[in-house]
């Protein structure tokens, strides 16, 4: 199946960004006289991720997070697999705030039996010295342990590795609206060939190992505890023969005491960066999206 580029970016901008920006203009006008100048803006995002895309939020110094994330199967099969609930992919993540500007994590995912580790660090904060946005760096490394030496006799450890680097740029426009832009570069040391339904090679994988993307996302606060979240990542140099799609995720956050519960629909099965950025197969137009959730507990 050949990949067809679709205009999800335009649809996203029209359906989600434009209405929220219009609302933000009203919020800004009503709050412009009450917002202190030269003061760091807090809580652009309440959770460490918007949905799949990392947010500019960091853990506070000394805070320890335990995060359980699930992605179920696509809903397209209906009751055959109970709308995807029979096919769960799970990620367990441990995250720690080293200090106010540095957060680290390690995680294990069922998708390709992947282990990943990452660092996230604040470079600039919105409001400090009247700086207009928050800028955060994010670097991750993932190890695919699903690859077996019996299938790949020349397999070496470096073949299991993939890397991602993102610059997360966010602005809190009002108490309700926050938006983020995420220029991204990622590299997969191993790209699997394209196979047919019998696992026979159709063609060598045409994708370049080093890939580029741009992510956009936002949060709109509905009530004191509820918010609407959406993120989308456009791949910028995907091979025309690729079967993979751009990840689009839509959901809600619920804040309850010491944890945040995120519920969403997404066409991405993987939860680590190089997985959802480069290996999303779901097509929203064909019902190939899944229910998922992230449960974030702070200690």
What are these model-derived regions, one by one?
Residues 1-42:
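Cleavable N-terminal export/targeting peptides
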Residues 5-9, 177, 223:
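Structural motif marking the loop-to-transmembrane transition
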Residues 25-154, 161-165, 171-181, 185-186, ...:
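Transmembrane beta-barrel domains of Gram-negative outer membranes and organellar outer membranes
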Residues 158-162, 170, 174, 207-211, ...:
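Hydrophobic alpha-helical segments and helix-packing faces
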Residues 181-234:
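A mid-sequence, solvent-exposed acidic-amphipathic segment
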Residues 191-195, 242, 275-277:
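Outer-membrane beta-barrel and related beta-rich outer-membrane complex signature
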Residues 210-212, 244-248:
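Charged helix-capping and loop-helix junction motifs
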